[in-house]
Amino acid sequence: MSKSSTGRDERIGDFVIENEIGKGSFAVVHKGYRLQPREPVAIKIVIRKKLTPKLLDNLEGEIAILKAIHHPNIVELKECLKTEHQIYLVMAFCASGDLAQYIKKRFDIYERAGMAEPDSLTKGFKPTYPHPVDGGLNETIVRSILTQLAAALEFMRARDIVHRDIKPQNLLLQPPDAAFLALGNPREIPQMKVADFGFARHLSVNTLAETLCGSPLYMAPEILRFEKYDAKADLWSVGAVLFEMTVGKPPFRAANHVELLKRIERGEDKIKFPDERSAGSLAREAARRQELGEAPLPPPHPVSEDVKILIRQLLRQRPVSRMSFDDFFASPVISDFKAFIRPRAQPEAVERYEDLQRSERSVIIPSSGIKHVSVSSIEASTQQPGVQPPVSTATSPPALESRSTQEASPKAITGETIAPNKTPREDARPPRTLPRAFSAKYVTGEPPQPEDLEKRVPPTMTRTPSSPGIPEGSLLSGERDEAPQATTEHFGSSKGGEDSFLGKEYVLIEKQSVEVNALADELAASPQSRLGLASRRPSRLSRLSSGPLPSAPGASPPTAPPTILSSKPIRIANNTNTASTGAFALPPGSRPSSFPRRASLSSSGSPSTRQGGQVITNMDAVASTQSNRRDGNASSFPKDEVSVLGQRLAGFGLSGSGVGGGPSSALAKAISMASLRLFGVPSGVSLRDAAALVRTRAQRRGIARATDSLDEAEMTLLSTLEDLGQKAFVLSEFADSKLAHFFPDGPHQLSQELDSSTATSGISPSRNSVQGSARRVGSISSSSSSAVDPVAAEAASAEALMLYVRSLAFLQRAITLTKRHVESRSRPGVPAVTSAELNDVVQWLRARFNEVYDKADFARSRCSELPESAQQVDKLIFDKAVEVARAAATDELENNREGSGWDPSHCLLAYETANSMLSSLLDPGEDAMSLSEGSILMIDGYVKSINKRLWTLQEQFGGGVGAVGAAGASPVGVDAEARPGVSRSRTESP
């Protein structure tokens, strides 16, 4: 809180909170003061409920760094306090604002700070260091601020701290203090302090995306290219800041970071300064401004040659060509300014300062906790004592405790891991032996009847590498360094040593996550072809978010028979903000989730009705399947064979020494019409209303073909993106179910606050009522979770992690296809014009990618080893798909009788889900693995059997309850021989 309702200042501990001076996404900065002794402070108030685990880690890192270091050019953290709802960082107050404001307004630092100016600076005296008329700062001031920044960076570098967010907004200014003046610095020059160490520990997906969207002007090109980068990225930022101080504007400017990178690359390391413009160019500019009636520009001021050389050496695109830190610290620009101020310096002050710079590196240990305090209102006469809030470990967010981190190493691979809640100094525990819960008994066959589906036992499935090595697009990093484009950030992990905060210079960022956010930003900023409000075809994903569409004239091609809806449509506000209303959100009766999702469990390769005789095919999936058939072999799948994803899980800090698997699913224990739940999710995935989703497929695709707003290439792309999104969705839901068995709280569950906020955004009351019941079921699970086996919980977390990684691979593949499509339509200097629908799809993919990434990080934090069941992720998916299909077959066999009033929606959604999961196995995706020929034939047999059952149900209930579409429509993906009378050419028509 910042102010009381009556406008009185508030008190936190020994500090009084005054007016607000800054604001961000997760924190507000207020001016304040300490009561005894009275001194001004800046109080950063962080709202705890807004912090994700990643942001909490960032805050923890910032606190740890600021507590461990003390330097005159780094903002001092005086105290850290917390209440039940806020965290308060009390820092030194820099009264003159930040460098960005100073460059822009070039104000008097004393006047800005509200202080009396020294006698030499009173009005009437000529400024000692006047600023250039055309912009920028006085060169002496520039050299001073650069020298101070270099001192701070040198101090941090000796302690293995890389700031990663150097920009003028994070360089705070104040009038010089006594210690600063004792070093010989002039009184007219501001003292600079580096602030905001939120990025110093590691760069998560959400913060990187925010940085890319907010302030890319000072980012190194290797970051903009999504490459592995080292500490030299800070040097590029220093060069950009130095250029802006000298000239008055950044060296490169653009509307978005994609265009910014293009301009940097076009510059070819040729940095031009205003004073280097030719006389002819200046004359043409003056004539142009005169014609427009604008005031003439002042002549550019000269820039010293040594400053130009330094800037050009810092702003080199390739890090290997960029000057080193040692060369930067010894550059003439810095050494000359040190020589300039040394004659006026006090020897004792210089000696103390140099000792500080050379001091032994500090051991930075994350804070083990922050003391609780009370917040009270400051009265004019008396103060009301605040009540100490209770310390609740059950409901409040966790304290900023030390989290162990580990790096992919031989010890991690052999099983010598560190316990999740222990620091690196504690003894490593031996690997656990996990219980084996998955059998490997499989037989082949392809019976089409539900009885056979129910009795069938699947054969062993084998996935073999189709190409050696690790693919470029893989989501997990391997051991090779020659492919920097394939690097990854270890989910929440970094090397932590006894005397090192980072341990290594290199910081691995998750390339694919950056690409997803980058492409989404590019499309959001690019021109889009927009239709009129009445004529624009709704987005495929927005239609999925909106539920079934009401019948309306012109909503489908004239040739399409009407689709009968047996229930009211689900209404969800059509919002382009994908973070709040996501496409593919679950229908009513869904299990709570961290984001509203719809179970669009169909895929382009599964049965679905169509309108107008049109079928949307997934060309990419077909090609992948054909490739699998060519490259596969009939070898069996040994139990101890580990997939590429499993082999490379060392990037997550996990070992592969465990054996066994996770808990059995609730679906295998009891299946009934009243309690059928996909994936056996304890918090409840009721299928009562799920048929509404399936019924909308024909309408959705019919409308997609009813307009000529998009060309064929984009329509094919959108269809492929939907298919990949659906595969990613079912795998993510499967992973959610594994976590929900053991963890009632986390990103895989929906908070009550999000539930209520979603209700106000347009979701029907029926959804809210069902979600309430789902939360009640979840509470039952949470009540029993305290008695679960921690070994089983760890195994389930590892399995969920592998499923999330597979889901991320499909989402990344969708982004890659979109990126190629956009690049093929771009021209130099002219961005591609994309449809609003494609932008909506990409925004949804971005939201889902970040969501699944956070879930994967959550799962990784709950496991330290990789059990055999998680290593064989293909087997996990196959087992569950067959289990879901069997449950549907049993339900159909026992209840589908004439006159029984049976609702087929449960079976339809279950069959669709199983089909999508099996289709994901036939699509190798990012792990560059191909199934053996026997496995492909076996899975294909299951897919055909499921398709036949789907078609039978659609034929039987085509005009009644649970209808998926109009009678006579052909399902997508069913082979011609699967249904008599349907030609292959018709089934494969675009």
UniProtKB/Swiss-Prot annotation:
UniProt gene name: ATG1
UniProt record, GO biological process: autophagosome assembly; mitophagy; piecemeal microautophagy of the nucleus; protein transport; regulation of autophagy; response to starvation; reticulophagy
All copies of domain Protein kinase, residue ranges: 15-334
Subcellular location(s) per record: Cytoplasm; Preautophagosomal structure membrane
Annotated knockout phenotype: Prevents vacuolar accumulation of autophagosomes and affects survival during carbon starvation.
Protein name: Serine/threonine-protein kinase ATG1
Known catalytic reactions: L-seryl-[protein] + ATP = O-phospho-L-seryl-[protein] + ADP + H(+); L-threonyl-[protein] + ATP = O-phospho-L-threonyl-[protein] + ADP + H(+)
A UniProt-annotated Pfam family: ATG1-like_MIT2
Taxonomy, superkingdom: Eukaryota
Active site: D165
GO CC terms of this entry: autophagosome; cytoplasm; cytosol; phagophore assembly site; phagophore assembly site membrane
Extent of Low complexity compositional bias: 529-554, 587-613, 772-784
Gene Ontology molecular function: ATP binding; protein serine kinase activity; protein serine/threonine kinase activity
